């Protein structure tokens, strides 16, 4: 079978031939339909993050945003033809309470592998195997968009963790602010705008018009905020202090500055990972005081569990195809991997399709 693999010693992506995997007892064989490409994949391909190969191998099959169809149920409770999206993390060894509880998204580093990212092969191949517990069903009508489930699950986790942090009182949020207009930021904005949690949404970027990302923001009903014209501490006076902020930029200063944009009792979740070390100058006393006296919170959020994937699949089923189509700027075959990984101002989400 064909697979797209990273050889980290170069680093280089290659299309290679690998044996079709044989499912072990309790695993199903999945035929890959499509795999989304995000910023993490590009950083992995460039050798900036992840890229650890499985034991005894010299390459890593990349790709973690996948949708596939059950080819061989192999005695599991799945049926041939079921459309599924795979989770990303797998436990290292046995005895993980996080794995036993279905909470690998909260497991400490070193206790898991991440398929297509580090330590375990991913899904950018014609077939892969997985246990049913690491697969989430998707409506057949959304099979062409199932690669959105994994990134959308991050938004669902952020909302879940935020609601848990505010479950001790009658919190009534009405506004949300997405920091970053890359593919995750635009997907997050789309989820927040089409959901029923918030009445108003905003999205931060650094683009001049005309621009396809600004078009997406405004077409779904959000308000574009240019960070070159308006700082985060100025944002509340011009627009409003927001109840929820979802950071995707990986810009270290945003971990601090986003708090300025929050309303009392507001929450910011951090999803972006900085590419390098950076020094941020702040008034520590004012920052500390603001968090305390206005009950604000900062949460780090990474990965997602099965319940978040299910919530993402439910959202996907209800979202118009036209909205999802606006987020996809290129679909390529596995032999067009250079084109699929190319990035430009016009790029939002690119996809590798194994049905081409």
UniProtKB/Swiss-Prot annotation:
<feature type="binding site">
    <location>
        <position position="40"/>
    </location>
    <ligand>
        <name>substrate</name>
    </ligand>
</feature>
<dbReference type="GO" id="GO:0047934">
    <property type="term" value="F:glucose 1-dehydrogenase (NAD+) activity"/>
</dbReference>
<keyword id="KW-0119">Carbohydrate metabolism</keyword>
<keyword id="KW-0479">Metal-binding</keyword>
<feature type="binding site">
    <location>
        <position position="150"/>
    </location>
    <ligand>
        <name>substrate</name>
    </ligand>
</feature>
<keyword id="KW-0547">Nucleotide-binding</keyword>
<dbReference type="GO" id="GO:0047935">
    <property type="term" value="F:glucose 1-dehydrogenase (NADP+) activity"/>
</dbReference>
<keyword id="KW-0520">NAD</keyword>
<feature type="binding site">
    <location>
        <begin position="301"/>
        <end position="303"/>
    </location>
    <ligand>
        <name>NADP(+)</name>
    </ligand>
</feature>
<dbReference type="GO" id="GO:0008270">
    <property type="term" value="F:zinc ion binding"/>
</dbReference>
<dbReference type="InterPro" id="IPR031640">
    <property type="entry name" value="Glu_dehyd_C"/>
</dbReference>
<feature type="binding site">
    <location>
        <position position="114"/>
    </location>
    <ligand>
        <name>substrate</name>
    </ligand>
</feature>
<keyword id="KW-0862">Zinc</keyword>
<keyword id="KW-0521">NADP</keyword>
<keyword id="KW-0560">Oxidoreductase</keyword>
<dbReference type="Pfam" id="PF16912">
    <property type="entry name" value="Glu_dehyd_C"/>
</dbReference>
<feature type="binding site">
    <location>
        <begin position="181"/>
        <end position="184"/>
    </location>
    <ligand>
        <name>NADP(+)</name>
    </ligand>
</feature>
<dbReference type="InterPro" id="IPR013154">
    <property type="entry name" value="ADH-like_N"/>
</dbReference>
<dbReference type="InterPro" id="IPR036291">
    <property type="entry name" value="NAD(P)-bd_dom_sf"/>
</dbReference>
<feature type="binding site">
    <location>
        <position position="64"/>
    </location>
    <ligand>
        <name>Zn(2+)</name>
    </ligand>
</feature>
<comment type="function">
    <text>Catalyzes the NAD(P)(+)-dependent oxidation of D-glucose to D-gluconate via gluconolactone. Can utilize both NAD(+) and NADP(+) as electron acceptor. Is involved in the degradation of glucose through a modified Entner-Doudoroff pathway.</text>
</comment>
<feature type="binding site">
    <location>
        <position position="303"/>
    </location>
    <ligand>
        <name>substrate</name>
    </ligand>
</feature>
<dbReference type="Pfam" id="PF08240">
    <property type="entry name" value="ADH_N"/>
</dbReference>
<dbReference type="InterPro" id="IPR011032">
    <property type="entry name" value="GroES-like_sf"/>
</dbReference>
<dbReference type="InterPro" id="IPR026583">
    <property type="entry name" value="Glc_1-DH_arc"/>
</dbReference>
<feature type="binding site">
    <location>
        <position position="150"/>
    </location>
    <ligand>
        <name>Zn(2+)</name>
    </ligand>
</feature>
<dbReference type="GO" id="GO:0005536">
    <property type="term" value="F:D-glucose binding"/>
</dbReference>
<dbReference type="GO" id="GO:0019595">
    <property type="term" value="P:non-phosphorylated glucose catabolic process"/>
</dbReference>
<comment type="similarity">
    <text>Belongs to the zinc-containing alcohol dehydrogenase family. Glucose 1-dehydrogenase subfamily.</text>
</comment>
<feature type="binding site">
    <location>
        <begin position="206"/>
        <end position="207"/>
    </location>
    <ligand>
        <name>NADP(+)</name>
    </ligand>
</feature>
<protein>
    <recommendedName>
        <fullName>Glucose 1-dehydrogenase 2</fullName>
        <ecNumber>1.1.1.47</ecNumber>
    </recommendedName>
</protein>
<dbReference type="GO" id="GO:0070401">
    <property type="term" value="F:NADP+ binding"/>
</dbReference>
<feature type="binding site">
    <location>
        <position position="65"/>
    </location>
    <ligand>
        <name>Zn(2+)</name>
    </ligand>
</feature>
<keyword id="KW-0614">Plasmid</keyword>
<dbReference type="GO" id="GO:0070403">
    <property type="term" value="F:NAD+ binding"/>
</dbReference>
<feature type="binding site">
    <location>
        <position position="38"/>
    </location>
    <ligand>
        <name>Zn(2+)</name>
    </ligand>
</feature>
